[in-house]
């Protein structure tokens, strides 16, 4: 059915970079040259979900990329722990898979994610008092979009002020295809990062190797 609807996969393809020569690859040779890593065992998914207990490993049934693949397994951490891991990865020039609730307080023209972008409370004459935990529990917020977390702006004390992600909506959207998020927005609407294990503390890695991760649902 996939071949009928999408076409037969190519056996080779040509890959070229700006100011570089084109080179022909098979999918396997491309993987070996540009990745060369064990994508299954070399990474760990980290979640910030304050509605569930921190420092526990969770597994979601039937949330996988292929029928015979593994369920999503993640370690739930406080936001500050995730920030430390993300900063360590970025300082080592290693970008990360990142997911968030991208539609909240997004100014797409400026490419800015900031809870202070819009003053809904003054406009509506009310207050919105739910915190992140309550928004998750009432399904008012959740992970809706994945991007590449690639940069962070730190103050003199080494604390993050804002973050940059590379998006997939084209170069005319946001700042040349990128979005900037304030650290305040990161706290409220960031949900997942996938980091290489070498940036993750041993105490966090030890939580992955339990025999029966907790089912959150």
Regions inferred by a protein language model and the residue ranges of each:
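Aromatic-residue-lined binding/catalytic grooves and analogous aromatic/hydrophobic interfacial grooves
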Residues: 1-62
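Cell-envelope/ECM-targeting effectors and their regulatory/trafficking segments
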Residues: 12-19, 110, 152, 202-203
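Short, exposed beta-strand "edge-strand" segments with a Pro/Gly-rich flavor and a Y/T-containing core
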Residues: 17-25, 70-77, 173-181
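Long, positively charged binding patches that form subdomain-scale interaction surfaces
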Residues: 66-147
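C-terminal soluble interaction/assembly domains
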Residues: 128-206
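Single conserved hydrophobic/aromatic residue that forms the stacking wall/gate
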Residues: 208-217
